[in-house]
């Protein structure tokens, strides 16, 4: 059976943490920020951990 190829979109969007969890950025913080409140943009600033169910699929995409 041939090797699985890494999903290009997934490798750009997800990073593996030291403990083995997957990290992702939050949506809605790229552009059109002028009409969004400062409170909202601050809340969207940090990275989040991917949920277990989603992580299983993403791991396959990344070949982990």
From Swiss-Prot:
One of its GO terms (molecular function) is structural constituent of ribosome. One of its GO terms (biological process) is translation. The keyword Transmembrane helix does not apply. SUPFAM superfamilies: L35p-like. Keywords: Ribonucleoprotein, Ribosomal protein. It comes from the Bacteria. GO terms for cellular component: cytosolic large ribosomal subunit. This is Large ribosomal subunit protein bL35. It comes from Arthrobacter sp. (strain FB24).
